[in-house]
Amino acid sequence: MHEWALADAIVRTVLDYAQKEGASRVKAVKVVLGELQDVGEDIVKFAMEELFRGTIAEGAEIIFEEEEAVFKCRNCGHVWKLKEVKDKLDERIREDIHFIPEVVHAFLSCPKCGSHDFEVVKGRGVYISGIMIEKEGEE
């Protein structure tokens, strides 16, 4: 389950940051989940809560934001979103993209010109977009 590995990496990053900043407590963490990753938000949240247990981040608010997948055709310049073509993909293909987002080029093509030569503008990956900490003596 790669969600636990993602949660572990997020937790280690949050705790490292908090330590470097001299935090007494982590109040909140905001995590952006790229739509192409199709990450199980509930699993990541549960894993983070478990991994935060016994640390200065225990009880921190965990906020998720999904970043929609956007593509740009290198052939004709057309920009489109995954949600515009997702219904045309069968479940197996969606699962393949979930586990290996790089395969998206094999399964998608520009809805305007049909080219498979496109870039992923956004919506790939997982990253921390904010960490709210508290230092001793602050509220």
Swiss-Prot record:
Pfam families: HypA (PF01155). One of its GO terms (biological process) is protein maturation. InterPro entries: Hydgase_Ni_incorp_HypA/HybF_CS, HypA/HybF. Disulfide bonds: none annotated. Keywords: Metal-binding, Nickel, Zinc. One of its GO terms (molecular function) is zinc ion binding. PROSITE patterns: HYPA. It comes from the Archaea. Ni(2+) binds at H2. The keyword Repeat does not apply. Zn(2+) binds at C73, C76, C110, C113. Belongs to the HypA/HybF family. Involved in the maturation of [NiFe] hydrogenases. Required for nickel insertion into the metal center of the hydrogenase. This is Hydrogenase maturation factor HypA. The gene is hypA.
